[in-house]
């Protein structure tokens, strides 16, 4: 191998590393900013799902005045979402490369599989523990005398009462929701982006407004197809879920028999609001951060120079 070939190989390797780092940084920034803006809608969604209890024991607790209480459980959710978003984009890019042909092309089914893989990966590494902490904090705030002081206190209670496995309570419905959600969201976003790109003059870029709209539509599609899984996930992560439900299948049957089919879409409007906004924010910020990092990337400059 010539010195030039070695240089080109090293440049390509550095560029791949740079791409992964860019995805990681951009995903974290996009996820963190999205939660800071949209968390009150997540709080409302979770409260609505926890309030749906049938019969004489219906627990419709008065809503707190809008303010800091609407950010209860935000810190673990913010951390988890930032990590999750990074994992989602990095793993999605990785799975797409694995499923692509020799020319780098990937089918729509391949995009769907990459989305499922990204969802399962993010659920395992970030989502389930952070959402478990968030859910019990929000549920605790519904009590007349809340006992959980902060996120660290919530973690100590989970560890004390349930051990390490307590952080993964609701893992299967969470994984199902994340896998389906990522497949639908990323798949629909990629498809819609390809459609818009095909109608864009050659060499032209999709503008910020169009990117926001595409991301928002992808978020809206995701909500109504995955809301039943989200409702089951929330119920399975509440404080007394193990004694009340046992497992996700019993939980789903109980919701259907006691509350009716529509109960699976509890909080759908609030989640729609959040995911429509977050879909636009995440994809728009992600694309812009990646563009900015590409401008200052040494690997990018070397490749152009080569």
UniProtKB/Swiss-Prot annotation:
GO process annotations (BP): fumonisin biosynthetic process; mitochondrial citrate transmembrane transport
Q: Which GO terms describe its cellular component?
A: mitochondrial inner membrane
Q: Does the keyword Hydrolase apply?
A: no
- Recorded metabolic or biological pathway in which this protein acts: Mycotoxin biosynthesis
Q: Does the keyword Membrane apply?
A: yes
Cellular localization per UniProt? Mitochondrion inner membrane
Keywords from the named record: Membrane, Mitochondrion, Mitochondrion inner membrane, Repeat, Transmembrane, Transmembrane helix, Transport
SS bond partners:
none
KO phenotype (gene knockout): Produces fumonisins that lack one of the tricarballylic ester functions.
- A GO MF term: citrate secondary active transmembrane transporter activity
Solcar repeat boundaries on the chain:
18-98, 109-195, 206-292
Question: Record's InterPro entries?
Answer: Mitochondrial_sb/sol_carrier, Mt_carrier_dom_sf, TXTP-like
What residue ranges are annotated as transmembrane? 24-44, 67-87, 113-133, 170-189, 209-229, 267-286
Primary location group:
mitochondrion
Family according to the record? Belongs to the mitochondrial carrier (TC 2.A.29) family.
Biological function: Tricarboxylate transporter; part of the gene cluster that mediates the biosynthesis of fumonisins B1 (FB1), B2 (FB2), B3 (FB3), and B4 (FB4), which are carcinogenic mycotoxins. Within the pathway, FUM11 is involved the addition of the tricarballylic moieties to the carbon backbone. FUM11 makes a tricarboxylic acid precursor available for fumonisin biosynthesis via its export from the mitochondria. The biosynthesis starts with the FUM1-catalyzed carbon chain assembly from one molecule of acetyl-CoA, eight molecules of malonyl-CoA, and two molecules of methionine (in S-adenosyl form).
**What is the protein name stated in its UniProt record?**
Tricarboxylate transporter FUM11
Organism encoding this protein: Gibberella moniliformis (strain M3125 / FGSC 7600)
Q: What is the lineage of its organism?
A: Eukaryota, Fungi, Dikarya, Ascomycota, Pezizomycotina
């Amino acid at each position: 191998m010539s010195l030039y070939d070695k240089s080109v190989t090293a440049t390509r390797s550095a560029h791949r590393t740079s791409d992964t780092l860019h995805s990681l940084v951009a995903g974290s920034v996009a996820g963190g900013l999205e939660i800071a803006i949209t968390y009150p809608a997540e709080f409302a969604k979770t409260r609505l799902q926890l309030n749906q209890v049938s019969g004489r024991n219906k627990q419709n607790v008065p809503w707190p005045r809008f303010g800091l209480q609407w950010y209860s459980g935000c810190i673990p959710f913010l951390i988890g979402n930032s990590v999750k978003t990074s994992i989602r984009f990095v793993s999605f890019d990785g799975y797409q490369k694995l499923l692509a042909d020799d020319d780098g092309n990937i089918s729509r089914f391949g995009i769907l599989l990459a989305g499922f893989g990204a969802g399962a990966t993010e659920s395992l590494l970030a989502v389930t523990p952070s959402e478990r902490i968030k859910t019990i904090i929000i549920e605790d705030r519904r009590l007349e005398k809340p006992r959980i002081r902060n996120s660290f206190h919530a973690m100590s209670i989970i560890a004390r009462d349930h051990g390490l496995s307590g952080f993964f309570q609701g893992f299967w419905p969470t994984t199902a929701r994340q896998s389906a959600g990522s497949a639908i969201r990323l798949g629909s976003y990629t498809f819609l982006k390809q459609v818009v790109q095909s109608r864009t003059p050659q060499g032209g870029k999709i503008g910020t407004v169009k990117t926001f709209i595409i991301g928002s539509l992808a978020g809206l599609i995701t909500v109504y197809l995955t809301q039943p899984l989200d409702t089951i996930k929330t119920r399975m992560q509440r404080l007394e879920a193990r004694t009340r439900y046992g497992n996700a299948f019993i939980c789903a049957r109980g919701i259907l028999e006691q509350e009716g089919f529509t109960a699976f879409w509890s909080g759908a409007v609030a989640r729609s609001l959040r995911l429509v906004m977050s879909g636009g924010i995440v994809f728009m910020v992600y694309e812009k951060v990646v563009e900015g990092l590409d401008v200052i990337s040494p690997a990018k400059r070397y490749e152009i120079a080569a």
